[in-house]
């Protein structure tokens, strides 16, 4: 018989990923798998089975090739003619956690389960984080 998890049966772990010197996309891909719970044998498609993920050293993550100068982040303010464009070099210098969140959230589906998974993502520019009391496990890439 196939096991179908219920919302109350899901046990959530905490994982910490160090992004220092690692490609942004590889860190984001592993974080997305952990957030969705795809690494668990008890995954159920209609239940949020994911874990909590802490990503530290987002400022030290690297972009390969010429992406730092060529890749752009676009957002719209809602006003006519106000499409804001920012290069990733500027984004990584000013808001490295936003760059990591954009990468991870782009790999998670836009559903109610995906939005719930995005709330369990915690990104920090440095090596310190306030979630030591949860006793997170180190996740090696």
Spans of model-derived segments:
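Ribosome large-subunit tunnel/peptidyl-transferase-proximal elements
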Residues: 1-102, 112, 130-141
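C-terminal structural segments of small proteins and small subunits
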Residues: 101, 105-130
């Amino acid at each position: 018989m196939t096991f179908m998890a219920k919302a109350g049966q899901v046990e959530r772990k905490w994982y910490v990923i160090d992004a220092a010197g690692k490609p942004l996309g590889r860190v984001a891909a592993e974080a997305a798998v952990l957030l969705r719970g795809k690494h668990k044998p008890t995954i159920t498609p209609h239940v949020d089975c994911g874990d909590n993920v802490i990503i530290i050293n987002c400022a030290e993550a690297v972009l390969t090739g010429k992406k730092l100068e060529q890749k752009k982040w676009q957002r719209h303010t809602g006003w006519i003619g106000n499409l804001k464009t920012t290069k990733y070099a500027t984004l990584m210098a000013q808001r490295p956690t936003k760059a990591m969140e954009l990468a991870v959230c782009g790999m998670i589906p836009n559903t109610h389960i995906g939005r719930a998974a995005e709330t369990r993502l915690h990104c920090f520019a440095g090596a310190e984080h306030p979630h030591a009391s949860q006793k997170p496990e180190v996740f090696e890439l």
